[in-house]
Amino acid sequence: MGRAREMGWMAAGLMIGAGACYCMYKLTMGRSEGNELEDEEEDEWEDGQDLDEEEADNWFDFTAMARPWSEDGDWDEPGAPGGTEDRRSGGGKANRAHPIKQRPFPYEHKNIWGEQSFKSFTCILDLNKCVSTQRKKRFTKNINAGFSLSPNISKHLASLSVVGNRSPTPHPTVREKALFVPENPNSSLENQGQIKMSIDEVCRETLLCCCKSFLQQAGLSLLISMTVINNMLAKSVSDLKFPLLSKGSGCAEVRGLEELMSLSEKPVLVGEALAAQMLSSFMCLFTRSGSREMLVEAISP
């Protein structure tokens, strides 16, 4: 009887001890889970602050980041078209230079005026009655990538059309012939011959109308530019005898002299006929009364 009672008390003690251990275990686990939740919340809050700081840093980097091209449109940093860029090739290998392909627009920096942009620009300037503005507009550069001729010729074609449109001559035929120059010329000999015939007539008729010779100067500049790329026109241009330089206005004479002096640096391109005309024009101006000052102004640096 006593033995059974002892066994009962022992079983009860074991059950009470097991219950106490279980309660202690639950209390300990609950406290640990609470601490972990608090730690996770603190970590999330700290991560959020780190992300905000990183976003601020990234925003600063994007606004202060240097462009891959300079103000002139030239790529001057790694990653430029046709350049190389250092990349980690992986596998513990050293850095290698990988070629970079040409990047498409808008990464390709372009600064070319289109034909429509130039027309809009000239229309705006037409509304301006200032004499100096109109004079500058007469020699505005129009460089269009669609022109098959050189940019210099395209510039003079545009100048000739603008000058013809603003010409104060009373004869409408002169303006029509000046505007007859096609907007998108090609390099064919037939088309160049038509341009030359039109300019010849414009120069001669404008000379009779005393049109300040600006239209003549634009035509002369175009012809000189075309002689550089076409030997046939180099021979025919001497037939004009440069009436601009012998009978034109002072400002146009100086501009014509500047054109001829620029050609004197390239005698191989312009040929002997044009070089002889240049020399005779210089002599004619030098012997004329009141022309020496213009000659000094033209040849001075």
From Swiss-Prot:
Q: Which Pfam families match?
A: Arm_2
Disordered, as annotated region: 69-101
Q: Which residues lie on this side of the membrane: Mitochondrial intermembrane?
A: 1-7
What InterPro entries does this protein's entry cite?
Answer: ARM-rpt_dom, Armcx_regulator
| Intracellular or extracellular location(s) | Mitochondrion; Mitochondrion outer membrane
Q: What's the protein's topology in the membrane?
A: Single-pass membrane protein
Entry's transmembrane regions: 8-25
- Region annotation (Mitochondrion outer membrane (MOM)-targeting sequence) ranges: 1-6, 26-36
This protein is called Protein ARMCX6
Q: Which organism's genome codes for this protein?
A: Mus musculus
Lineage start: Eukaryota, Metazoa, Chordata, Craniata, Vertebrata
> Gene for this protein?
Armcx6
